[in-house]
Structure formats: structure tokens, C-alpha cells
């Protein structure tokens, strides 16, 4: 029984299945996800159907694209949120969800996604968020789900896009992005999720491969699974991390270990 974490999927079914085959994902294993199941990629419905079929063996945190999908399914989406979603690649998911037969079941599934997953040896969250924002929560972070996140007060713009909650600035303090002036200590001061427990995130697609900053103790495994060379001048990959061994493999066949790719 192994535990795997997959980066943002974004409707990239074929690459997802390739990566899972390469890591030898089996019927006894559990698959975690950094969020963002749909949008941008070509096979949103296939991804939803497959992941739902895993039942309790699949666990995903809330990504910003999942928020839009849930709003649409629960008929709470505003015009501004809908426009923002469409601008960010949501049209393919809209068409899937508009015609979906099991809308109630899919809505319940999305609604169950938590903001954060805390395990004994790692935590999973879509991206890093400032401590001052998370400390406002009226609900313990571990109890926030898609259904109650609007009541938690950690999301300022439920009907649009909250760039404070879905933040990239803290991650950009890593030497991966800022070789001359890295600020891992400042990042830890800004986000209390950076501590002795490994934090695994997605949200920020990486064209240079998996990020593992040992000093910040954060790992980003979003390697742009939806990207195509024709559109983005980069052939995206879905990366799957074995959290027990720290080995990972991507859909191109590249494999390594976090210790081998750590930012020094």
C-alpha cells in the first residue's frame, strides 16, 4: 500500500494515466492531488470519472479551478467569476458539467475537497498563503472544505479570484526562482505552513521540473500537465510523487528522487 501525490491535473487524462502506469499505481494504493482537476486540458470528464471511481483512495485539496467548478455545479457562480473562469481555461469544464448526468454526485464530490490535508509526515495544500490571512479563519484549517470555505473568512473574493489565498509570492522566495536573493527564512516568517513537516503544493506550473527547496521544506510538483508545445512552447508533464520513498516520475518517463533535485 503506497501513497502517491499527483500535481495539478487540468483535464490531462492521458498524461495522468501514463504517469500512474510508470509509478506502478495499484488497486491498494492511495492517490492524493494538489488540486485543479479540470480546465485547460482536453479530457476533463475522463479525469473526473476516473478519480471518482477511486472513491476513498483519492484525496484532493481545493484548487482555485475547483472553486469555480463547484460554484458552477452549485449554481452560485457570479458573472465576474464565470468570466474569470472562462478566461483561465474553464470553457471545456463548463461544457462537461453542463451536460453531466450525475450532477448531484459530482457536486458532492467537489464539495468534500478540504483546504488542507495534514498527515503525520507531510501536508498537502494547493499553494502557500500568508499567515496573516490564514489566522483570520473562523474555522480550523483542517475542517475547511469547499462547502464551508466561504464562511471561514480566509477567502476574500469567493465570486472571482482570490490572489491572496491562491498565492505565488511566497514560493518565489525560493532559490529555484531567485538564485541571487533567495529568502527562505522570510518565506517561513510569512507562512506558518513552512515548518519541519514537508509541505507539498501545486498551482505554480514549473517548466524546469519538480521544485524541492529543503531549506523552506516545500515541494511543488505541478509540472504543467496541460501544456502543449504548440500553445505554450513547452510540452507539459504530469508528475506523481511517492511520498513514502520520495521518488517521483513524470509522464515523459523522467524519474528521480527529491533529494537529487533539491535546491542547494
What are these regions (language model features)?
Residues 8, 36, 51, 63-64, ...:
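Divalent metal-coordination and catalytic microenvironments
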Residues 184-250:
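Conserved beta-sheet core of the metallophosphoesterase superfamily
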Residues 6, 77-79, 99-103, 131-140, ...:
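Catalytic phosphate/metal-binding cores of nucleic-acid and nucleotide-processing enzymes, i.e., regions
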Residues 2-10, 122-128, 219-221:
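Active-site-proximal beta-strand elements of phosphoester/diester hydrolases
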Residues 10-14, 39-42, 66-70, 131-132, ...:
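Active-site environment of divalent metal-dependent phosphoester hydrolases
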Amino acid at each position: 500500500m503506497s501513497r502517491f501525490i499527483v500535481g495539478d491535473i487540468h483535464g490531462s487524462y492521458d498524461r495522468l494515466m501514463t504517469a500512474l502506469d510508470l509509478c506502478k499505481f495499484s488497486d491498494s494504493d492511495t492517490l492524493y492531488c494538489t488540486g485543479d482537476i479540470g480546465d485547460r486540458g482536453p479530457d476533463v470528464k475522463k479525469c473526473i470519472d476516473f478519480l471518482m471511481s477511486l472513491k476513498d483512495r483519492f484525496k484532493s485539496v481545493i484548487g482555485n479551478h475547483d472553486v469555480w467548478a463547484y460554484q458552477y455545479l452549485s449554481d452560485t457562480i457570479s458573472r465576474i467569476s464565470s468570466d474569470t473562469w472562462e478566461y483561465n481555461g474553464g470553457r471545456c469544464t463548463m461544457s462537461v458539467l453542463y451536460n453531466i448526468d450525475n450532477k448531484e454526485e459530482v457536486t458532492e464530490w467537489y464539495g468534500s475537497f478540504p483546504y488542507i490535508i495534514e498527515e503525520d509526515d507531510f501536508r498537502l495544500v494547493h499553494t502557500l498563503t500568508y499567515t496573516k490571512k490564514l489566522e483570520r479563519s473562523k474555522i480550523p484549517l483542517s475542517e475547511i472544505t469547499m462547502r464551508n470555505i466561504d464562511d471561514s473568512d480566509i477567502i476574500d473574493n469567493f465570486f472571482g479570484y482570490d490572489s491572496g489565498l491562491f498565492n505565488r509570492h511566497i514560493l518565489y522566495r525560493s532559490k529555484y526562482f531567485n538564485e541571487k536573493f533567495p529568502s527562505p527564512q522570510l518565506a517561513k516568517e510569512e507562512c506558518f505552513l513552512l515548518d519541519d513537516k514537508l509541505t507539498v503544493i501545486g498551482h505554480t506550473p514549473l517548466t524546469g521540473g519538480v521544485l524541492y527547496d529543503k531549506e523552506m521544506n516545500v515541494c511543488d510538483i505541478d509540472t504543467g500537465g496541460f501544456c502543449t508545445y504548440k500553445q505554450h512552447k513547452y510540452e507539459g508533464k504530469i508528475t506523481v510523487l511517492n511520498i513514502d520513498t520520495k521518488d517521483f516520475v513524470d509522464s515523459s518517463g523522467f524519474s528521480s528522487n527529491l533529494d537529487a533535485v533539491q535546491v542547494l
